[in-house]
Amino acid sequence: RPRFCELAPSAGSCFGFVSSYYYNRYSNTCHSFTYSGCGKNANRFRTIDECNRTCVV
């Protein structure tokens, strides 16, 4: 899996509400979270399927 999958999720610092997904390295699963619209890192996906394909072993 790519190294960015190990990053903690980042909600960002703006005021938007975008439903997103991140990979949780401890449970080896993807979870939903609310992204603010800016200040992201690479461990953010638009769909749970994209997260699973990229990060779940």
Curated annotation (Swiss-Prot):
Disulfide bonds: C5-C55, C14-C38, C30-C51
Similarity field: Belongs to the venom Kunitz-type family.
SMART domains: KU
Site feature: Reactive bond for chymotrypsin: F15, G16
Tissue localization of expression: Expressed by the venom gland.
Biological role stated in the UniProt entry: Serine protease inhibitor that inhibits chymotrypsin. Also interacts with vasopressin V2 receptor (V2R/AVPR2). Inhibits vasopressin binding human V2R in the nanomolar range (Ki=7.87 nM), and also moderately inhibits vasopressin-induced cAMP production (IC(50)=208 nM). In vivo, intraperitoneal injection of this protein into rats increases diuresis by 1.6-fold, without any loss of electrolytes.
Domain BPTI/Kunitz inhibitor residue range list: 5-55
Entry keyword annotation includes Secreted: yes
Alphabetized UniProt keyword annotations: Disulfide bond, Protease inhibitor, Secreted, Serine protease inhibitor
SUPFAM superfamilies: BPTI-like
Entry's localization field: Secreted
Protein name: Kunitz-type serine protease inhibitor
GO MF annotation terms: serine-type endopeptidase inhibitor activity
Cellular compartments per GO CC: extracellular space
InterPro entries noted in UniProt: Kunitz_BPTI, Kunitz_BPTI_sf, Prtase_inh_Kunz-CS, TFPI/VKTCI-like
Pfam family, one: Kunitz_BPTI
